[in-house]
């Protein structure tokens, strides 16, 4: 049986940190030690920020983004193009597109992708809400910004079928050679998609 080297409060902190993505037990222990050593400069502000997050962060009832206001900052921004809705699986995908300044459209977060093996079906996603939004006359294009995985593509096909009766253009992100990518290191599927979706130079 492994012996504990710290009191129960510190062990609890380590256990909670180890639940975070990318942090195993060893990384969690290092993070806990760092927080404890920087108690005033780091731990107290972090605890305060977490308390604010618990009290104020909510899910946007329009798009599914998380924010401290509802509708969220993006949905409330009049500079956003109301004609375009970018569909993503998760809030992290929305944030990635925002960091890249990839679109001035609005978003719709599905909450996941269809995955029969994980028991995730259409009823677990916000597809019905997307269909309702797509029927608003000012919406003209739905961009499917879903991962190029089996689950992502299955979801894209399902969403496209559900949007058949809406008077919108449905597009998806191009797949292919990444910026700075070398052909020799790319998988066959990526190369095949890049060749099929080639554009004029």
UniProtKB/Swiss-Prot annotation:
Species of provenance: Afipia carboxidovorans (strain ATCC 49405 / DSM 1227 / KCTC 32145 / OM5) (Oligotropha carboxidovorans)
Function of the molecule: May play a role in DNA repair. It seems to be involved in an RecBC-independent recombinational process of DNA repair. It may act with RecF and RecO.
Recorded name of the encoding gene: recR
Ranges of residues in domain Toprim: 83-178
Coiled coil, from the record: none
InterPro entries reported in the protein's UniProt record: DNA_Rcmb_RecR (IPR000093), Rcmb_RecR (IPR023627), Rcmb_RecR_Znf (IPR015967), TOPRIM_dom (IPR006171), TOPRIM_RecR (IPR034137)
Zinc finger C4-type: from-to: 60-75
Protein keywords: DNA damage, DNA recombination, DNA repair, Metal-binding, Zinc, Zinc-finger
HAMAP family: RecR
PANTHER family, alphabetized: RECOMBINATION PROTEIN RECR
Family: Belongs to the RecR family.
One GO MF term: zinc ion binding
Highest taxon, organism lineage: Bacteria
Single GO BP term: DNA repair
Protein name as catalogued: Recombination protein RecR
Residues that span the membrane, as ranges: none
A Pfam family it matches: Toprim_4
């Amino acid at each position: 049986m492994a012996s504990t080297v710290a009191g129960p409060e510190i062990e609890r902190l380590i256990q909670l940190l180890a639940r975070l993505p990318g942090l195993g037990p060893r990384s969690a222990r290092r993070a806990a030690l760092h927080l404890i050593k920087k108690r005033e400069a780091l731990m107290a502000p972090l605890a305060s920020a977490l308390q604010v997050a618990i009290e104020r962060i909510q899910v946007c009832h329009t798009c599914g983004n998380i924010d401290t206001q509802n509708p969220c900052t993006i949905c409330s921004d009049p500079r956003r193009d109301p004609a375009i809705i970018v569909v993503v699986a998760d809030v992290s995908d929305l944030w990635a597109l925002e960091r890249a300044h990839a679109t001035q459209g609005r978003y719709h977060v599905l909450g996941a992708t269809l995955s029969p093996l994980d028991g995730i079906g259409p009823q677990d996603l916000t597809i019905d809400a997307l269909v309702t939004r797509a029927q608003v006359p000012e919406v003209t294009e739905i961009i499917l910004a879903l991962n190029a995985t089996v689950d992502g593509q299955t979801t894209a096909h399902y969403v496209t079928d559900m949007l058949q009766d809406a008077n919108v253009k449905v597009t998806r992100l191009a797949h292919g050679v990444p910026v700075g990518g070398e052909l020799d290191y790319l998988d066959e599927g990526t190369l095949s998609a890049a060749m099929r979706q080639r554009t004029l130079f």
